[in-house]
Amino acid sequence: MTPKQSPNSETGAVTEPPLVLVTGPSGAGRTTAINVLEDLDFEAIDNLPLRLVPALVAAGGADRALVLGLDPRNRDFSTEAMVDMIDMLKARRGLKTTVLYLDADAEILLRRFSETRRRHPLSPAESPELGVSRELDLMQPVKERSDVVIDTSDLNVHQLRAEVERLFAPSGRRLAVSLHSFSYKRGIPRNVDMVFDCRFLSNPYWEPALRVHDGRDQEVQDYVMSDARFQGFFDRVLDLTLSLLPAYREEGKSHFSIAFGCTGGQHRSVTLAETLAKALAREGQQVSIRHRELPGQQLK
């Protein structure tokens, strides 16, 4: 997740329900994000032609927040028209407009299309690679105008739901913390604030009885925690986390993410994420966990 500056250019008081525009390339999770916002009591309208948006907003009279799904596949879509519309809405006094852009790497979008066996809407008679490339180029100026960009390349539907809820759920919730485990072989996860390398700890992978298990299992956790270096490392991580959370909360941050990495992303990093989650929960902290290398679901 990449938040940018305040979504509205004007400084007047907000007098209308918030407006969220959700867009992004096909296959990046736009529909999922809209569904989450609808569950949060937003009035949702998907695939609205661009020419109808200004009139809808000008009509006013809404009694709850509105989310509009803007699809680059629409017949009247043009990058210039959408950028102009975004600028117009952000300049409207009394209206808080937020542009949420769902993004993903080209190879991930291609994989999602191949898994669903769908043709790409911008190249129905040509290769999907060409369609993905065209759409990413087409949407780049819109991405640059967006207030929040969520890269869903490494997210499944549940993790995207959690991200959207943290951003748009009603105010008053606690600062949400998400903990991640990962394998360095696949690179550091996107959208994380702090990363810890756990590869110095004893590796359960080399124990045949533990290799088939993961860090959610007690026997693996016991093995990792038996390393004399574990407790000192964990205590420092916990102290650092607990000292940072109030500062981030005061700054208005709604979400803080911490990632633990090891060689395979199955044992040590999972153990650290699970152990920290339990410790933070005992402090009354809202926590979610994501183990990237363990099985998950794909976005649609």
From Swiss-Prot:
Organism domain of life: Bacteria
This protein's name: Nucleotide-binding protein TM1040_2438
HAMAP family reported in the protein's UniProt record: RapZ_like (MF_00636)
Cystine bridges: none
Organism this protein belongs to: Ruegeria sp. (strain TM1040) (Silicibacter sp.)
Chain sites annotated for binding GTP: 71-74
GO molecular function, one term: GTP binding
Signal sequence, start to end: none
Family, similarity comment: Belongs to the RapZ-like family.
Keywords: ATP-binding, GTP-binding, Nucleotide-binding
Record function comment: Displays ATPase and GTPase activities.
Positions with a binding annotation for ATP: 24-31
